[in-house]
Amino acid sequence: MKKQSGMTLIEVMVALVVFALAGLAVMQATLQQTRQLGRMEEKTLASWLADNQLVQLRLENRWPALSWSETTLQAAGVSWHIRWQGVETDLPQLRALDVEVRHAKSDKTPVSSLRTYVTSP
């Protein structure tokens, strides 16, 4: 009797399951990386907007108010809500300036927030 060489149907099916699971793992990793890339792009843009607002406020050379001020603008095809306020410090001639960037005014947490310190003009 001759011995037949080759793979049985069960062996082929097990190999297909292994390759299918590996393919699913690769697809899931790629999807997660794509989502993270979008979030990173969003945070980078929000950080730039916060930095631009800080620079604009510094160039105005005004003492920051202790209440929130706000504006809405369009950047990269998206509407952004930016707000800022002065915060008292232990030194009367120094004030903290906080800037927060959100997608909407009603968002609970900002996408980006920055703080700098300004001296009395």
Swiss-Prot record:
The keyword Transport applies. PROSITE patterns: PROKAR_NTER_METHYL. The chain crosses the membrane at residues 7-27. The modification N-methylmethionine is found at residue 7. The keyword RNA-binding does not apply. It is found in: Cell inner membrane. Disulfide bonds: none annotated. GO terms for biological process: protein secretion by the type II secretion system. Keywords: Cell inner membrane, Cell membrane, Membrane, Methylation, Protein transport, Transmembrane, Transmembrane helix, Transport. Type II secretion is composed of four main components: the outer membrane complex, the inner membrane complex, the cytoplasmic secretion ATPase and the periplasm-spanning pseudopilus. Interacts with core component PulG. NCBIfam families: gspI (TIGR01707), IV_pilin_GFxxxE (TIGR02532). Component of the type II secretion system required for the energy-dependent secretion of extracellular factors such as proteases and toxins from the periplasm. Part of the pseudopilus tip complex that is critical for the recognition and binding of secretion substrates. PANTHER family: TYPE II SECRETION SYSTEM PROTEIN I-RELATED. This is Type II secretion system protein I. The gene is pulI.
